[in-house]
Structures are given as C-alpha cells and as structure tokens.
C-alpha cells in the first residue's frame, strides 16, 4: 500500500553480521574483496536451519538522545476536518432488568474515561461469543445463534488519514461506531504484553545485505555538497540525501521531515535556498523538498491548491533569482500528453503557469541565469527538440525559433557559461564522430560555437552537461564502467578533466564540480545478485579520482529484512519473509528458541504467506532470477523444522511470453491448499493466478476465473464450510472495486457481489478469516475523498456481507487479522502520520470493534511503530496467546519488533 519511526531508546544499531561488507573499499579503482559466496544447496531436498538463537536481553530504559526528524517514507497525507469534541458517554449500569428484551447500544469515540484497575491490561467490552477457530487460515465450527442488539446508531468522525505506497496497506480514519452492551459484564481482555527487538531473531545466513540504494543527482555551492537518490531497501523505502559541509572531506546522512515519495531525482540550490524533486515516473507520485542549508530537508506536502494535478510529472528544476522553476509534462484523462511548467518563490508554494501555444508536448530540461530561463522540449508535431524561453523567472514562456530536428530533448542537455547559455545534443554524434555545441547569450538566438571531439569509439556521445563556477562540463560514457569528463570555459575549447574507469557494474548519474574545483560523481553498483550499493567518486583539481568512503556514514547502511506473515499450529509458530535478499523462514516451538532457515540459490527471494494443512506446512513467495524475470517460490515442511523447495514446473511454471509470475497467498482447508498470485505479460498487463493442490505434489492452475482474472489482485483467501473464499480488489486505488470469489473445489471460481460500505466510492478487501463459522474481512474504502478501514462479516460464505467502520480517532492502518476462540484480533498502527504507535483492534462478532493503544516497550515512542503480522494460539483454558511482528523505523534507523500478549473473554 507501508514509515520512519524512532527506534527504542537505548537500542544501538546492531553490529553487522560477520562476513558481510555493506560497502566496498574507497579507492580510485574500487577493490573487489572476496565475499562469502552464496550458499549452494547440494541437497535440494533439505534446507539448513541456522540453529537456536539466544534471546536478547531487554534494553534498559534510558533517556532518548535521538535528535533527528521522523517521517514515513512512502505515505501521502490527506488533511481532513478535525472531529468536534463530544461529551463522554456514561457507562451502562452493571445490572440490567431481566425484562429488557434487547441490550442497549452505545457510541464509542475514544477509550472510556478513567483508569482501569489493572493498568497492565487493555480491556475491551462487548458481548459474549461462542468459542471459535484460532487462525486466519483455519475454519472454525458452525456459528451459534447470535443475539442482535436494538436499533443500530452509527456516527462518524473525520480525522487526518494516511495512504501508504506499500503493498496491501490499509488506511483508517477516525469514526464513531456502536458496540454491544450485554446483560453480563462480559468482554475481551487483551494484555499489554511485552515487546522486544527482533533484529537478532529474524536474520538468515547470506552473502549480501539485500540493499538497493542509488544516487541520481548532485549539486554544490560554496563548501556544501549534496547528493540525492533513493533507498528502496525493502520494505521501508526512503528518499536519500547525503551532505558534506566541507567540500567533500566528510559526509553524513541528511535530515528529512515530512511525508513524500522515496525517490529523489534532481537537486539545485545554494545561498540559503535549495530544492529537490522526485518521483518514480510510473506510479504518478511526485516529491518536492526544500532546504536552507542542504542538510535539513522538509517535504513539501501542500504545494498549492491548483499547482499540481493527477498526471503531472516533473522532469527538471532550476533556481532563478526570484525562486525556482520546474518543468515536465501532464497526462490527461484521454491519455494525451502536454507540456507543464511551474514556478515558486520559496520552493514550498507553487503556481502553475500557462504552456498552451508553446507547441511542445513535454519539457525535458531547464536552466536559469538570473530570471532568464531557458528550457528544451519535444515539439507537438514531429521529432527533435525545440527551445523555450522566459524572461521573468518562469512566469511567462515563449517558443524560440531554434529547433534541432535530429536531437531528442533530455535532462542534462542545457548548461550555463558565465556569459551565455550552452546546448549540447545528448547521445548524438555527427558522421565524423564529433558532438556539436550551440551557444546563446540570451537564450533567444542560437548558433554553433564549437564541437566536442576525440570521444571513444564506444561512446554514444555526451550523456549530460553540468554547470559550475568557471564553466560547463560534459559527461561521456567511454564504455561499460568507464566515464570521461571534459570541461570548457567558452563552449568551443574542451579539455579532459578526469576519467572514472574500472567501475565494473557501476552506473554514474549525478555530477557536480565544487567551488574548490573537486569533481564528484554519484551512482550505484551491483555488488552481488541481491545488493545494489552506492558509488560516490571524488576527483580533486590536482589529483587522481578516488572512491568516497561511505561505510562510515552513520545511518546509511541498512539490511533488507521483512516479516510478511505469521501463523501457528499445535504450539509452533512459523514466520516468513525475506532478509538480506534471501527468503526467510523462522520457527519456534513452545517458546524454546527461534530458528532461522535460508533457502540458498541465486536471485533475490522472498516469501509472502504460510499456512498449515493436513499435509503439513506450505510457504509461498517469489524468486527474481534476474531483473526481468520473476518465478514462483514454494517450500514445504512436514514438521515446520525441515523445509524443501517444490520444483516449479507444469502448472506452476511461467508462460514463455509472461516474464512475471508470483505466489503471495496460501490457505489450507479439508480439501487441500489454495494458492493465489499474479501474472504479468510483456506489456505489463496483470492477471490474478490461482492454484489448487490436494497433496502438495500435484498443482492445478485454475483456468476458470471471473473475467479471466484481468486486473484483479487477490490479497487473501480462507477455507469456508463448503470450499474456499478469496478476497481482493480490482481497478486503480481511487476507483477500486472489491473482489469476492468462491470455489467449491479450489479450481473453479465464481464471483460474488462486491463488498462496499455505505457511501464509499472505492473499496477493496485486504484480509479475511473464518470465525465462528462465518467470514470476517478487513478492507479499505474511500469516502468523501478520505480513506477508512472497515470490517465486513458474512454468515453465508461470502454471498452477502454486513459492514462496519473500524474505530480510530487519528490516522490509522490495519495490516493483519487473526481469529481465536475468544474473538478476533487485528493489528496495525494509530496516531499522527510519521508519529504513529502500534495498535490492536479486538472484536467478538466481526462488526463491533474496540481499538487498543499499545504504549509499552518498543510498541510506542518517538517516531513510527506498527505491527504487520499476527497469529493466535491456544495457551490454556484461560485464553489465547497472541504473537505479532512489526517494525520501528526512522530516517536513519530501522528495527524489527516481536510482541507477545494474551487474549481472554470474561463471561
């Protein structure tokens, strides 16, 4: 759908596991040190357990010393009206008349006033319910008769909400809901429990860290040097800002506040005004950040009411004497593209400027000298490039008469000399091998002023231009892993400034020359099949190029790790996910010790779900065998300890013209196992994929799916009394339709009516479980432009549903759902965006819910904490054991959370 949050006080970043090197040696020719090779599995039918791990001692309580800012990296914030204060509702009397035919109904907007007599317990009131099943993927007994309350009265509140860009993220806003008030003092009781660090528990033996970091651009002013990019190390991506206050002698991770996209593409600035822009170019998300010093950055969350629209994309930015300009394109509802431009005085408040009449369909590059701005775009008719000009800081634009029919416009085509503008066609050489250079003193009239010659025969031409204090520099790629930089002070005479050679597997994208004359280059390098690490090079004015030592930058290195699902059976818990680029399996029996298992093999691997059935355990996921191909990953175990990989063949194999096929959902019932995933063709068109196996040996792919499964994403599935039910959604995020499929045999599926709360314009289901013989699901809906989490319950295996909103007084997200005999438990977070704490919701009927604030140990504090996976298991006659996995993360720290608690129902 998934945030920067504070680590637990006193938690120091753990030592990197021995044998791992997050970064290479800082030399001019990067040293390739021996790395522990990826483990080869000689016995493919056996997986090796890492052995018992000792439980870490709880950290002592000490005052927090972290001074950074805290934001979620991949969420957008939508402000909505704050709820009005309401009078507290008095508690009902403990005793009621036996003559009352119906129990009362009361509204709940916040936790009841006063303190509980047991402050270590979190108590939720509600009606007594019959005993039921104890897992999201397990079917419970037939339902008992349910006594209905009197007339239901519902009220709602609007509060700030959050929409995450992580997969399957549910967002809830505040809402008043009704709850039961029975004749007995009954209800669910959820203990506050204990949270502890999971950093040392959820690891796997691996040769790399699974990191995915890139540098995309650089800028410098005076002694400040800034490098920007992205850190999409799953599952907590963040925008990347590196800062040097002393001309590149030392580097540190910048400070970032606010909520934004995790990818920064461009940066400009100096003299107290800096601007960065970003976005991934495919999802439609944009990001803008401002800074006064290049170190502390703030995301622009409200750029202006009419400045940006859906379909806008920023290609380039420039600093002017009066502020900043941005250029790009916009895509209309009909799919047509048009030029777009914006200006701002301070980088925080933006206005859209008129671009009609410029006869270009997009603007790719822009530079400014004072308030004279020059841009280059693609003509509305034909190919090539057309130059545009503004004389007033980007408020008004005119098309010049200068065009280059043979050159495509690209970012980096334009540069600045002290007295004139410079244009160099990128990746374009003449028949003689030279590159033409054009100059203009005003940006209106252009003429050729020189050529760049002597390029390598392997070079396609100039990759980009950069401007610096004394002139311009042209970047050329001489071959794979080889770059040359040429400089000029007049546009006609060019001299080689530096070579960056022997950068095997590296790509350089960002360049800058500081006022002191040091040339910097930034990019990334494939360090292994699961690692993509930063590259930052520095070449002094008089000296050799050398690699900047980034391994010592505090908070920069991260190890990819994620726990995606958790389930239990007969006293054993099994968690699945990924760590260091490999699929991860972790298990514990009777709380002796957690054991970790690694699958080995090439490619980036992950597991998304796990279930237990009559034939044993089955975990499903995906393997990225290369950047273009993804295959299903299935592993099975009879005892939860020894796991073996299932051969992907037959119906499990990809079609030849479909490079992408994954499995991310599994459930088990009396008939067998149902798996769900996604298939994509070469054009990127996706379809749902479903399989059934009765014995974990023969897998049958369903050929009969409603509408062929086109555009459908199945998020969860569960066994029902007469087969299986799968839930999910189809369509875009703001126009999603919920999906409910039913199958008698796990192979042939039919669609049932969509589930949508009243007034919702968009709705999708994310989790489903079986409880007391009925289906209970959690979903997300769009109402009046705001997202809310809702629950749905069905007594007839998904044929019809009743819905209710989940209570939340602030922004909230619900990630997982589990069922016990005592009731239902859902987990996620609640609070201010970027400052939320872990939260749990409980219910005894699937429709009336109570939110529990979890404030102890690692579950709350500075920053963002959340629980993402939950499982329940029968502990004893007094109640059920609740185990949840989660995360606590900041911009420069990231920790896993293990929470244990218990759930009981008083009668």
Where are the regions a protein language model picked out?
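Short loop/turn motifs that cap or connect beta-strands within the blades
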Residues: 200-210, 253-260, 300-307, 353-359, ...
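Hydrophobic single-pass membrane-targeting/anchoring helices
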Residues: 142-187, 422, 519, 618
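Blade-level signature of beta-propeller repeat domains, shared across WD40, Kelch, NHL, RCC1
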Residues: 510-512, 520-522, 527-538, 542-545, ...
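Conserved Ser/Thr-centered positions that define the repeating blades of beta-propeller domains
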Residues: 244-245, 290-291, 343-344, 390-391, ...
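Entry beta-strands of beta-propeller and related beta-repeat scaffolds
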Residues: 220-228, 272-276, 319-327, 371-376, ...
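Short glycine/acidic-enriched loop and turn motifs that connect beta-strands
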Residues: 231-236, 280-284, 330-335, 379-383, ...
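Beta-strand-rich domains and repeat architectures in extracellular enzymes and scaffolds
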Residues: 204-239, 264-265
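Repeated scaffold domains used in trafficking and secretory/extracellular systems
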Residues: 211-217, 260-269, 308-319, 358-369, ...
